[in-house]
């Protein structure tokens, strides 16, 4: 992967670019004028990343920015990855772990609307109130999400799906998301050990359900790298081999129908369980591709 130039995999399908120092107007114009879904990877690392490592590699904690307005997860590690002049106003949380959720960071970038699972809504309200008071910033509107109930957020249709993950709150239902716009159906899945049956059914990718509908794009966590398929974290996270297996099944059952040449993007990669970006670029099985901090991808419909 050329990390400093446009990556053209299919003229009609996908555009990816490395965007260190990107101008806000470029990002905004692409998001507003496109009939696709623009994703900027703010961070692609798992919880064990903390700055540049001994190899010179650096991944911030996992977070994405959708169409310049909507964040999915956000922590202080990603504050420097928001393009200058871009002002996200909304955040969607997958769960309450500290490598995904930080109320102070959300308030500092100007978030006014927060969406998260109703199973920890009261906790989040309390913590956001404390953060808002500490920073002397306005309290955002916090909306509880319910599994399977789609909501409209900044021109996106977002459907919460149950994840296979656990937090310190045994009653919390962690989430992954189906994100839809202009024919794009993106599965954003982190943190989760595979795709739970209920999530597959709701998203339309369970082959048992003949009325299902294919997804067209995938961003999936790969906490564990190649050779770590039997890692102890496999109940709550997914390996590279696990993602590849999921993709094969979805392709075989025709429940994943991407534009020609479009990769499946990996995120949430553990520092101790993966090689360098260059090693991942050359060593991952097709169609998997390791995302990196600052990567932008324009997903388009088939």
What are these regions (language model features)?
Residues 5-26:
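N-terminal export signals
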Residues 26-36, 119-175, 180-182, 288-297:
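Metallo-beta-lactamase
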Residues 32-84, 172-191:
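Conserved beta-strand hairpin/beta-sheet module of binuclear metal-dependent hydrolase folds
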Residues 39, 95, 158, 191, ...:
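Divalent metal-coordination and catalytic microenvironments
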Residues 44-46, 69, 75-76, 96, ...:
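Active-site metal-binding loops of divalent metal-dependent hydrolases
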Residues 74-122, 212-218, 223:
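Active-site metal-binding motif and surrounding structural segment of the metallo-beta-lactamase
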Residues 91, 187-188, 266:
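Structural beta-sheet core signal
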Residues 195-298:
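Cap/insert and terminal regions of metallo-dependent hydrolase folds
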């Amino acid at each position: 992967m050329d990390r400093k130039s446009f990556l053209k995999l299919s003229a009609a399908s996908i555009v990816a670019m490395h965007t260190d120092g990107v101008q806000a107007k470029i990002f905004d114009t692409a998001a507003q004028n496109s009939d696709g879904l623009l994703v900027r990877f703010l961070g692609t690392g798992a919880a064990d990343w903390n700055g540049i490592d001994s190899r010179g590699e650096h991944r911030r904690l996992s977070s994405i920015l959708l169409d310049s307005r909507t964040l999915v997860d956000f922590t202080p590690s990603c504050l420097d990855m928001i393009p200058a002049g871009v002002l996200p106003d909304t955040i969607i949380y997958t769960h309450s772990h500290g490598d995904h959720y930080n109320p102070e960071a959300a308030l500092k970038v100007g978030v006014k609307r927060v969406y998260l699972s109703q199973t920890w809504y009261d906790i989040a309200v309390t913590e956001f109130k404390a953060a808002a008071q500490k920073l002397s910033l306005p309290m955002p509107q916090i909306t509880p999400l319910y599994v399977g109930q789609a909501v409209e957020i900044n021109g996106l249709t977002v459907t919460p799906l149950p994840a296979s993950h656990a937090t310190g709150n045994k009653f919390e239902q962690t989430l992954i998301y189906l994100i839809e716009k202009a024919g794009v159906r993106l599965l954003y899945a982190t943190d989760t050990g595979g795709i739970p049956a209920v999530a597959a059914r709701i998203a339309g990718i369970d082959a048992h359900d003949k009325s299902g509908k294919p997804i067209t794009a995938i961003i999936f966590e790969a906490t564990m790298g190649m050779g770590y398929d039997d890692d102890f974290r496999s109940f709550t996270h997914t390996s590279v081999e696990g993602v590849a297996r999921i993709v094969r099944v979805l392709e075989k059952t025709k429940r994943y129908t991407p534009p020609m040449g479009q990769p499946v993007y990996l995120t949430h990669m553990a520092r101790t369980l993966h090689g360098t970006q260059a090693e991942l670029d050359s060593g991952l099985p097709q169609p998997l591709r390791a995302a990196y901090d600052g990567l932008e991808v324009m997903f388009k419909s088939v």
